[in-house]
Amino acid sequence: VEYYPGTEAPADYISHIRILRPGQGADSSSCSRTVSMNRILSEQGFRFYQSSFDEDKQGSWLTVNHDPWGIGITYVGYILLGISMIGILFSRKGEFRRLMNHPLLKKGGVLCLLLLAGNMQVQGRTLPVLNIRQADSLASEQVIYHDRVVPFNTPARDFVMKLTGRASYAGLTPEQVIGGWLLRPEVWRYEPMIYIKNRELCRLLNLKTSYASVTDLFDGQRYRLQDFWQGGRETGRKMSPLEKAIVETDEKVGLILMLQKGTLIRPLPKDGSVKPLSLSKVRAELIYNRIPFSKCLFMFNLTVGLLAFFHLVYCGLRHSSERSALSRRINRLFVAVLYAAFLFQLLGYGLRWYVGGRIPLSNGYETMQFMALCTLLLACLFRRRFPFTVPFGFLLSGFALLVAHLGQMNPQITPLMPVLVSPWLSMHVSLIMMSYALFAFMMLNGILALCIRRHGKMLMLLSRLLLYPANFFLGAGIFMGAVWANVSWGRYWAWDPKEVWALITFLVYGMAFHLKSLPAFRRPLFFHIYMIAAFLTVLMTYFGVNYILGGMHSYANA
């Protein structure tokens, strides 16, 4: 097992094997080969995949696949599907080109852009903490945390956030708080800073507020949480809210114990075996930690999006001749704010990419960030021809960031699992999230059409136009995921819930292409209602699978 330098996080699983080729006398031969994650060994039509290994790491488990013809045939099918989808988009006689040239939509730019896509002092309630100058200098010191070299500010911020639910505590910086715990734990253990949101657990612990100290959770040598535990982690048994709160509180206590034992944060080894971060990366991570990009942007985008949506409905209910110069100035203001929001989100996403050293698409938090970025980009591209994409961009990006915030998706930057280190994964996730963003636009487009009936036909044409790249992005993302699965595990399809629901989504939206066979889709009202209802399959694919069905693709808690 190869590890990331200075950490215990696996970077790759590698097996060294010797192949014996049977023969007679001098004709027999052998050779040494290597198998690892996403690196297949092919020998005489057999493909060997790294699967697992023994606990003592003395033996390796390999998956063997023999399908000499199937891979070529399958890949040719994927290529033909991709060529046909591109052909539909660029065919001069195709429906997509006809929709682009429709008089109701021909009012602005070209939609081909769719494809671009310690010294101690006493402060605050006599708590012993570092002075602010020492704390600030400590913030940029490099340590190993969660199997990654980071500035000290990162574990300090995560520690305070995990315990209190906030980025700071009692007016103290995260470095001051964690410094106090490291230097004077006998004082800080009496400080009520462990946030417990479950009222029943607070009552059982005799707490007057929603915050407990470490001493509140111990009665001498007895750990009080054990008295309330009912075994909610038994297989097949769902935990009650009280048991979930006990587990969450226990994790917070464990975090404090890990800090005191020295296992939560480790200094860089002095032998130089771990390469420190560059000064630019340290500064970038400090900026990323100190600016709450997601929290600021979801509140801002939802607020501005609602204002822009109400303004859009107000203008839509009036005739063009009645629209004032003030309305046009307000529209230009919303557009300027849209570009600013996009650049702010791009800055946050780019910083995360630069700090992590990889494209941020490995967990639920990062994919929602990418979806928010995609919706803002699409709104910027379409806003000249379709002004209503401006409020849509604000609202969709705001909801995406809100879901990431409320769902408590893990915002920590961690090394990638070996199986995720693949360019196929990045393309797979990027295409699918682009399709989800377009489907979300179509859903809001349907809602707007129900509010402003007289624009129903034009909005239906727009949704039909977006349907082509949206469903094609989803289809391309599905078969790129199949290629990635074949490279990693030796199979294209495993009937995992996420795979099945992605296929269901692809088929549900695919029905809307068949206007001749299904004449109901020619009626704007039916079409818009169908697009709104179809978006439920997207929600099920992304959120329902993560939180309800589970499976290999589930990263609700990632």
Model-predicted regions and their roles:
Residues 1-558:
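Solvent-exposed, non-transmembrane regions of integral membrane proteins
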